């Protein structure tokens, strides 16, 4: 069984899917896939073009937003991931090799819109442990506050920001 970890009602993370796993992603109700794993990363896995074809064969919208571990905190990388979160149909499944980079990128985006500790709490509730990055999340968010992308981002609000990014409340 393919592992999918729900972070919010509209966003989940997981490891690199194999070809057969795109059916499981669709059957789990996901509408889109974000691939964070670069094509030149070591290991045996699907290249982005192959993953896109498999996703589209299942009726899934596909986005390629590659980042290696060293580029996670670059503003362009975070902006690209945020655009995918805004533009893709929901719910979204995001992956890298293990799901950790996808989780960190989600937290970086969420921290632009709410307190980093709340994003960390959502990930902790989903079984992810990235609390050690709270200072980095806060610093990254401070770099973009007030930027044109943040100020004109009505699309993020209209898609239900609280559902995608979490509202910081635990049930």
Describe the function of each predicted region.
Residues 96:
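Short cysteine clusters
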């Amino acid at each position: 069984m393919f592992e999918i970890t729900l972070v919010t009602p509209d966003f989940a993370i997981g490891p690199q899917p194999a070809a057969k796993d795109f059916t499981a992603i669709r059957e789990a109700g996901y509408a889109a896939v974000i691939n964070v794993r670069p094509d030149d990363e070591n290991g045996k896995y699907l290249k982005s073009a192959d993953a896109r074809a498999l996703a589209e064969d299942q009726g899934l919208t596909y986005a390629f937003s590659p980042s290696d571990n060293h580029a996670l905190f670059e503003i362009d990388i975070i902006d690209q991931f945020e655009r995918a979160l805004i533009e893709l149909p929901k719910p979204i499944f995001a992956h890298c090799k293990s799901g950790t980079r996808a989780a960190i990128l989600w937290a970086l985006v969420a921290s632009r819109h709410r307190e980093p500790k709340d994003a960390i709490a959502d990930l902790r509730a989903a079984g992810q442990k990235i609390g050690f990055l709270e200072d980095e999340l806060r610093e990254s968010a401070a770099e973009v506050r007030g930027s044109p992308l943040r100020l004109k981002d009505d699309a993020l609000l209209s898609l239900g920001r609280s559902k995608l990014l979490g509202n910081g409340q635990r049930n």
